[in-house]
Amino acid sequence: MTRFIFITGGVVSSLGKGLASAALGALLQARGYKVRLRKLDPYLNVDPGTMSPTQHGEVFVTDDGAETDLDLGHYERFTGVSARRSDNVTTGRIYSDVIARERRGDYLGKTVQVIPHVTDAIKEFATADLTDEDFVLCEIGGTVGDIESLPFLEAIRQLRNEMGAERSLIIHLTLLPYIPSAGELKTKPTQHSVKELLGLGIQPDLLMCRSDRPIPEAERNKISLFCNVRREAVIPALDVDTIYQVPVSYHAQGLDVQVCRHFHLPMNEDLDLTRWQTIVDRVRHPEGEVTIAVVGKYTSLIDSYKSLAEALVHGGIANAVKVKLVWLDSEIFEREDAVHYLEGVNGILVPGGFGERGSEGKIEAARFARERSVPYFGICFGMQMAVIEFARHVAGLPGASSSEFGVPEVPLVGLMTEWVRGNERVARGSGDDLGGTMRLGAYECHLRALSKVREIYGAEVIHERHRHRYEVNVTFKDQLEEKGLAFSGMSPDGVLPEIVELPDHPWFIGVQFHPELKSKPFDPHPLFTSFVQAAITQSRLV
């Protein structure tokens, strides 16, 4: 029997519902249960693929090619369960589905309404595509009281009535602000948030109260009294110094125990969270430190590179060092000399991105790394800019550029018009829609024997996740290799360059895919582990 846990939020946004869901999933896994986590987003975009990273944060891509919310990255990193397209839905996707059904005549002439048609579609999503999971955790995006969230909250109210308390649990995450002038935590915002939820017909079973300090018993009792929940079900969600402390902290506060008691499940009181504590200890007590510059164009919001930042943390954990990140806007290097900003770093990483803005700055960062023998890691757009830099300054192609920026003299990077997905050929054109038309999801890549990446992966064939519509032009492969740039990873048909490297450089690798999406604290991605190791070596040479 699959049990459902719905996680809502109140008072303010960005309280950490995604991390709370991921941490609870990890705790239930530690108790031997199989879990799946889902995110219901109340915005009208069909998916976040066309949303600005500086508004929404990164787009997390799944193996099956879905562009999803960054919280699915937390779910994967904490539980190790690969997310699927069916694990993220938006209001836009729900409405598109309902309207398509209406056009087909599926509703047989009925007046299509939010209730029951939209809410039924939401319920179908929440309960579909399941196998033998013990728990499904559904996070409801947004904040209680937002007009956009109402159909989703109504849907979970109906699901609760249909399933009963035996199969469903509702958790409400809220905020207890501290008022310095009063010298106390205030419970009134939480009371009003729960009142708003009750007005929608939903009684939460557990309250998770975010706070930057311990919550006195008097406040917990007060919340219990006015919000109509048991005192034991008022769970402190205290701030921690690393997100990997969250499962340990929530277990200490009894979150997983209360969930199991709600469902009348047997419990092993000696829950082993040793591996989580080991990760926390390594983060808190590193044996050294390296500095890595991330040269990007969306650095005004670090969540634009959430998986990237976490993957570098994982690489640091694997090497027992702290990775200090220096976030640099690539446009700076189009106005100023890169030396001033980069001469003190131990590694340079240029992540993915879109458009011409800041591209020349990324090219300058790649040039600095190549000429100064500083470890360089180019991801997606960062690989393309590294290849353009090499072509201009080493291979004698000063007009090399990308067709993404116009009509270049030397079209070194161009729009992919077709590629193979499984056994099918996919075709695209320059006039196609932007949403959902990129090369998305996991693809196979063959690694060249005796290459650095072959040594790093320890495998001949790998599968990595992609999100791009431009690719290095394979017709220039021989010309660039003659000058020393190795194309060490290719698509199975040999048409799409996936990895380049400089064999004579200490560590210079560019990849067309996004390895950060598959890195986990207990299974760091080998490229990030190796990159941080190279940064350690470089730090000893300075």
Curated annotation (Swiss-Prot):
Domain Glutamine amidotransferase type-1: 291-541
GO biological process, one term: 'de novo' CTP biosynthetic process
Residues reported to bind L-glutamine: 353, 381-384, 404, 469
Coiled coil is among the record's keywords: no
Sites where the protein binds CTP: 13, 146-148, 186-191, 222
Residues reported in the UniProt entry to bind ATP: 14-19, 71
Reactions catalysed, as given in the entry: UTP + L-glutamine + ATP + H2O = CTP + L-glutamate + ADP + phosphate + 2 H(+); L-glutamine + H2O = L-glutamate + NH4(+); UTP + NH4(+) + ATP = CTP + ADP + phosphate + 2 H(+)
Residues annotated as catalytic: 380, 514, 516
Region (Amidoligase domain): 1-265
Pathway, per record: Pyrimidine metabolism; CTP biosynthesis via de novo pathway; CTP from UDP: step 2/2
Entry's Gene Ontology cellular component terms: cytosol
Keyword Metal-binding: yes
The entry's keywords: ATP-binding, Glutamine amidotransferase, Ligase, Magnesium, Metal-binding, Nucleotide-binding, Pyrimidine biosynthesis
Binding-site positions, Mg(2+): 71, 139
Activity regulation summary: Allosterically activated by GTP, when glutamine is the substrate; GTP has no effect on the reaction when ammonia is the substrate. The allosteric effector GTP functions by stabilizing the protein conformation that binds the tetrahedral intermediate(s) formed during glutamine hydrolysis. Inhibited by the product CTP, via allosteric rather than competitive inhibition.
Residues given in the record as UTP binding sites: 13, 186-191, 222
PANTHER family with a match to the protein in the record: CTP SYNTHASE, CTP SYNTHASE-RELATED
Family: Belongs to the CTP synthase family.
HAMAP family on file: PyrG
Protein function: Catalyzes the ATP-dependent amination of UTP to CTP with either L-glutamine or ammonia as the source of nitrogen. Regulates intracellular CTP levels through interactions with the four ribonucleotide triphosphates.
Record note on quaternary structure: Homotetramer.
Protein name: CTP synthase
Primary gene name: pyrG
